[in-house]
C-alpha cells in the first residue's frame, strides 16, 4: 500500500552488517502482493473489490504457499479485510505475525477500537506499547512532537508515553526548528527562495534534504525551480511539471489524465530511495522523511481540486 516503504525497509536491512539470505526476504506492499499471488494461481483481479474480498483465494486455498513469518509496517493504513485475507490464506497456525502501527498517523480514517487504537481482529489481546523510547529524535523534536499530540490529537487518540533520549542512538543532529509563516497566497518562488536561503545559510548538502507536503501540487513547482534555477537533480515520488503539463495537453478526459498521472506516481514510488545523493521531494503519504538530516515541511491550505485531496492534522 505504501510503495516507497518497501525500498526504505530494504535499505535499513542492508545497513545491518550481516550476511542475510536475501532470497528468504519478500518485501512488497499489499496490493502488489495480492496481485502477484492472484497471478500465481490464475485468479483474475476484478477491480479494487478483489483486494477486500476475504474469500478471494478460496478456490486455491489448498495450493497457496504460506509464510513462517509476516511483518507489516504502517498497519494503521490497512483495511481490516486486508489483514483477514493475509491471516486466512498466507500464514500457518504457528507462524509469526507481527504488525507495527501508530493510530495517530491514521490519515485514511480507518476504524479504531474502544481504546482509540487500530482494529486488528486477527491478533488477540492488547497492543504491545513497549517500543516507547525514541531512537531517532533529539529532545527538541521529541518535545515538539509530544506538545503537538497533546494540543491537536488528545481528543481523538491515546497519546504516546514516549521516552525522548537526550542522546538517541540514531541521532541525526536535527537541532534547528525554524518556522516561516508565509500565508495562504505565497508563491512557489517565495517558498523556493526560503529553501535556497536556508541551504546557503547552513551549508546544506542536497543529499541530506527532504521536502514534504500533503500533496504533490506545490512540490511539483518547487522541484521545477530546483532543477531550472539551481541546476540540481532531484528524487521524487510524483511527476515532474513537464510531465504534468504534457499529460494535460495529451489526455482528453479527467479520468485519462488522472490515470496517466497515477501511473507515473506508482512508478516513482516503486523506485524511490533515500540513498540517491539528491534532494528528495515527496508527499507525506509516501515518505515521512524522519531519517533525513534536514526536512522542509510545507503545510498547504485546503485544496479541493487536487488529485489527492487530503487535509489532516495526522499528516503533520
Please provide the spans of the model-predicted regions.
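Conserved Walker A/P-loop ATP-binding site and its immediately adjacent core
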Residues: 1-13, 28-32
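Helix N-cap/beta->alpha junction signal
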Residues: 1-2, 79, 215
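Phosphate/oxyanion-binding active-site loops and adjacent basic polyanion-contact surfaces
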Residues: 5, 137, 141-142, 183-191
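A short helix-to-beta-strand connector/capping loop
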Residues: 18-26, 124-127, 172-176, 274-278
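Conserved helicase NTPase motor core
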Residues: 23-115, 289
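Conserved RecA-like helicase ATPase core segment
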Residues: 85-173
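Core RecA-like ATPase module of SF1/SF2 helicases and allied nucleic-acid translocases
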Residues: 116-143, 148-150, 196-314
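Inter-lobe coupling/hinge region of RecA-like P-loop helicase motors
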Residues: 126-130, 155-193, 204-213
Amino acid at each position: 500500500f505504501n510503495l516507497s516503504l518497501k525500498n526504505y525497509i530494504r535499505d535499513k536491512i542492508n545497513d545491518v552488517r550481516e550476511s542475510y539470505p536475501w532470497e528468504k526476504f519478500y518485501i512488497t506492499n499489499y496490493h502488489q502482493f495480492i496481485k502477484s499471488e492472484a497471478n500465481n494461481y490464475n485468479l483474475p483481479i476484478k477491480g479494487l473489490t478483489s483486494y477486500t474480498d476475504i474469500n478471494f483465494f478460496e478456490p486455491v486455498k489448498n495450493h497457496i504457499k504460506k509464510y513462517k513469518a509476516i511483518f507489516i509496517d504502517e498497519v494503521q493504513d490497512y483495511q481490516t479485510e486486508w489483514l483477514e485475507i493475509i491471516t486466512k490464506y498466507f500464514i500457518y497456525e504457528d507462524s509469526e505475525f507481527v504488525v507495527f502501527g501508530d493510530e495517530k498517523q491514521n490519515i485514511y480514517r480507518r476504524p479504531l477500537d474502544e481504546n482509540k487504537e487500530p482494529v486488528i481482529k486477527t491478533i488477540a489481546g492488547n497492543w504491545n506499547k513497549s517500543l516507547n523510547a525514541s531512537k531517532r529524535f533529539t529532545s527538541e523534536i521529541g518535545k515538539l512532537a509530544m506538545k503537538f499530540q497533546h494540543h491537536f490529537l488528545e481528543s481523538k487518540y491515546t497519546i504516546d508515553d514516549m521516552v525522548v533520549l537526550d542522546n538517541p542512538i540514531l541521532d541525526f543532529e536535527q537541532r534547528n526548528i525554524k518556522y516561516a509563516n508565509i500565508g495562504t497566497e505565497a508563491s512557489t518562488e517565495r517558498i523556493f527562495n526560503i529553501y535556497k536561503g536556508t541551504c546557503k545559510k547552513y551549508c546544506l548538502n542536497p543529499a541530506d534534504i527532504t521536502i514534504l507536503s500533503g500533496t504533490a501540487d506545490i512540490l511539483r513547482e518547487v522541484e521545477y525551480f530546483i532543477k531550472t534555477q539551481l541546476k540540481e537533480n532531484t528524487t521524487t515520488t510524483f511527476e515532474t511539471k513537464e510531465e504534468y503539463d504534457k499529460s494535460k495537453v495529451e489526455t482528453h478526459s479527467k479520468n485519462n489524465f488522472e490515470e496517466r498521472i497515477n501511473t507515473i506516481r506508482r512508478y516513482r514510488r516503486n523506485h524511490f530511495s533515500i540513498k540517491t545523493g539528491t534532494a528528495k521531494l515527496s508527499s507525506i503519504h509516501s515518505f515521512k522523511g524522519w531519517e533525513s538530516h534536514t526536512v522542509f515541511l510545507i503545510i498547504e491550505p485546503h485544496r479541493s481540486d487536487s488529485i489527492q485531496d487530503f487535509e489532516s492534522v495526522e499528516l503533520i
